[in-house]
């Protein structure tokens, strides 16, 4: 029912609440839906359904709401581990985040951890909601907490001095007890989110990229590669590059077909077959990508932020050490890589999230924020994201 009433003529933005346990993320989510969406009570959001992303089970609650300017899809996770998994797997892509900090406690360990994760996985912007301000009588104390939050954000390379911080009480909003710190604060928060979190560039406006899933030879016509266009547009007659695994080559797309029909272009979201000029059936393979020339480079060495599954989640039963050699599943293929642990880290236990250095045995078309699964013999044992490219 709720699906029908959202008009799609507004820009769509994906956001989520992050922050320390019990600082009020779920209450705030409920309060936002009260004024901007179809009201969802705290316990409706807290009973988050489980879903699978890259072979990992995550509990996530999804709500949607809209301001006069935008339509929002909002994710809230019940447990800390769910946040870690969610942000690393990209199960719920975030264009921005609302960091919830209790004014009574100030920044806590998970506050720091979520900011670090947001930095590592490339969340573009953060807005802060200083919650539970009714529990703090001293204005100076409130100012101190705000300063602390700004310094913490700056220490992780977010613009701490410029980030909007809105003070209020999610509970007051839910209980209609104090309009100023309740409803008014929630409306002020959403105005800040509207203004400060940038509208994401639509996939269709980005440079063309398509992971190759399959390769066919069609007699008399040449080689066709199939896959789902990840972003951008490819037009018949355009020059494109084949990147990854082998040296980069240029070719021309001489045909695009979808559902057995010939088209003059393929665009983000389309499952297409692309006919490639002068490419031998053996000259291209699954795991490579087609892309706009010069837009993506192949790389072997990168720093990754990774989450390692627990035994209960179907992961490893034992820790791993430096020189661990699993497969890294990028887009459509597995590539073996050698893992180097950070200095001072002797081993990584199942359930840890960790920053590691990886060197692949062959180069893969790679950009920062590219996500991957870590596998051993086809079984997923972890998930990760490229935090930065080394070479």
UniProtKB/Swiss-Prot annotation:
Cystine pairs: none
EC number(s) from the headed UniProt entry: 3.6.5.3
Occurrences of domain tr-type G (ranges): 10-201
Annotated Pfam families: GTP_EFTU, GTP_EFTU_D2, GTP_EFTU_D3
CC per GO annotation: cytosol
Subunit relationships: Monomer.
Domain of life: Bacteria
Binding sites annotated in the UniProt record for Mg(2+): 26
One term of GO molecular function: translation elongation factor activity
InterPro entries linked: EF-Tu_GTP-bd, EF-Tu_GTPase, EFTu-like_2, EFTU_2, G_TR_CS, P-loop_NTPase, Small_GTP-bd, T_Tr_GTP-bd_dom
Main location class: cytoplasm
Subcellular location(s) of the protein: Cytoplasm
Chain intervals for the UniProt region annotation (G2): 55-59
Native source organism of the sequence: Rhizobium meliloti (strain 1021) (Ensifer meliloti)
Catalytic activity: GTP + H2O = GDP + phosphate + H(+)
Family indicated by similarity: Belongs to the TRAFAC class translation factor GTPase superfamily. Classic translation factor GTPase family. EF-Tu/EF-1A subfamily.
Region (G1): 19-26
Region (G5) location: 169-171
Protein name: Elongation factor Tu
